[in-house]
């Protein structure tokens, strides 16, 4: 039976690989929607006023179909270091919130996850900035030829701190994001009329999608300002295509509200929300597919296509323990076949 909870039958590296591959597939599938979101946030060629279809069509006709996946390679590459840092940070933070019995509350779990995510985002922030720069540039007349070239060019032209432009918005945006997650998860039992540990897989999937949608909606203004700060550069054509001129984060908020109204802070939200269901749907499906392969490889199941358990195998054993047990019985079997003379 599939489960979204942590499975002790997988090694740490196997779980990381499952998460990385699932994330890469999800990002690749929803990359055109992510592009539409970022273009609307930055204000590139007034993409927020065109609509999703018109934005995609304009990019396709002017730059080619490959342009719909601009920046996706960098987004996929940063998954593994980001996941590793987030996991390490989570293990450190979770100890601080545990009670004497080693338990952690729902609120503490959300805060711990948010803090770990914030740390991983800050550590890998230069790759996020470069991803934005690659997405807003024209692939036919690129200012950056890839991750390494972009990193080197930005560092030489604008200095090291330019790679962290807008990072403060990540910290500020974590507050409404965590509040949105808490708001959803605190009301799950009322909505489903049952305890969390009895939720079905479909209910868990719906919970994740709703929590993501609410959290991202509340924190979206901070993400919009961050994208504008990331894209803006005097060394790029038209200052990176940003639709407002500003001198900092606070001024960027003011200029957006002044020129576009308060709703201008949510430009691109529709595309962002449309990618929630396919993103998590593909992520969960791909994670379970990879998980089945590793469970079969580790000897817990009879086939990589199903969750049918291997008879006689203790499913509570960890992979290393199961391997040692198999070696023990193999040696014992060989010893029993050896003649006494």
Swiss-Prot record:
GO CC entries: mitochondrial inner membrane; mitochondrion
Protein localization: Mitochondrion inner membrane
Membrane topology qualifier: Multi-pass membrane protein
Alphabetical list of InterPro entries matching this protein: Mit_carrier, Mitochondrial_sb/sol_carrier, Mt_carrier_dom_sf
Broad class of where this protein is predominantly found: mitochondrion
Family: Belongs to the mitochondrial carrier (TC 2.A.29) family.
Name assigned to this protein: Solute carrier family 25 member 43
Organism (species): Mus musculus (Mouse)
Gene that this polypeptide is encoded by: Slc25a43
């Amino acid at each position: 039976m599939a489960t979204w909870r942590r499975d002790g039958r997988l090694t740490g590296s196997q779980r990381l690989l499952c998460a990385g591959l699932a994330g890469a597939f999800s990002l690749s599938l929803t990359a055109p929607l992510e592009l539409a979101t970022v273009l609307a946030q930055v204000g590139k060629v007034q993409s927020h006023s065109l609509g999703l279809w018109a934005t995609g069509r304009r990019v396709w006709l002017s730059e080619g179909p490959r342009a719909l996946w601009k920046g996706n390679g960098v987004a996929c590459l940063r998954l593994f270091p980001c996941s590793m840092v987030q996991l390490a940070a989570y293990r450190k933070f979770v100890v601080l919130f545990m009670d004497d019995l080693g338990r952690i509350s729902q609120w503490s779990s959300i805060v711990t996850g948010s803090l770990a995510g914030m740390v991983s985002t800050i550590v890998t922030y230069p790759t996020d900035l470069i991803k934005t720069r690659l997405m807003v540039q024209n692939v036919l007349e690129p200012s950056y030829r890839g991750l390494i070239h972009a990193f080197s060019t930005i560092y030489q032209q604008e200095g090291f701190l330019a790679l962290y432009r807008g990072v403060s918005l990540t910290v500020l945006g974590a507050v409404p994001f965590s509040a949105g997650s808490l708001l959803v998860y605190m009301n799950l039992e009322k909505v489903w009329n049952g305890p969390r540990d009895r939720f079905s897989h479909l209910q868990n999937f719906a919970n994740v999608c709703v929590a993501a949608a609410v959290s991202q909606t509340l924190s979206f203004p901070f993400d919009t300002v961050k994208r504008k700060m990331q894209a803006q550069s005097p060394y790029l054509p038209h200052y990176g295509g940003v639709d407002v001129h500003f001198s900092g984060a606070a001024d960027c908020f003011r200029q957006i509200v002044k020129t576009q109204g308060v709703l201008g802070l949510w430009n691109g939200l529709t595309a962002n929300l449309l990618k929630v269901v396919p993103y998590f749907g593909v992520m969960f499906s791909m994670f379970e597919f990879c998980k089945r392969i590793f469970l079969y490889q580790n000897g817990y199941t009879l086939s990589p296509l199903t969750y049918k358990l291997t008879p006689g195998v203790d499913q509570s054993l960890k992979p290393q323990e199961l391997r040692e047990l198999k070696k023990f019985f193999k040696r014992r079997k060989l010893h029993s076949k050896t003649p006494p003379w």
